Amino acid sequence: MEQIKSQYIELVRFNLKAGVTTEQFLSAEKNIRGGAIQKQAGYQGRDIYQDVDGSWLIILRWDNKEAAEAWTPIFMTLKEGQAFGSLLDFSSARQEHYTLVNP
């Protein structure tokens, strides 16, 4: 198996706003995946998970911290980013960041 040389992950945990359906949220997620992020330098991918309590977790994978930090201000100016953000309960949101360590 090929070893990844560098990776930085961003974990975002959150709940949806009251009244937002799973279908609305997944449609917004699909728009993110098919949008500008595909061309963003250092972007490796993103995965989405849902817990049994209804909360969500998105794991974004980047080449490094700088690539992740460059995306954040861009994301919030995009139409799809604003639509996505409008569905989240930001009071429930938590972010964590990790850098891959290869022993």
Regions found by a protein language model. Give the residues of each.
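Helix-centric, low-specificity signal for extended rod-like, repetitive segments
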Residues: 6, 26, 39-40
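An amphipathic, aromatic/His-enriched active-site/gating alpha helix that lines ligand/cofactor pockets
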Residues: 31, 35-44, 61-96
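Short coil/turn motifs at secondary-structure junctions
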Residues: 17-19, 51, 63-67
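Intrinsically disordered, low-complexity acidic/polar segments
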Residues: 21-23, 55, 67-69
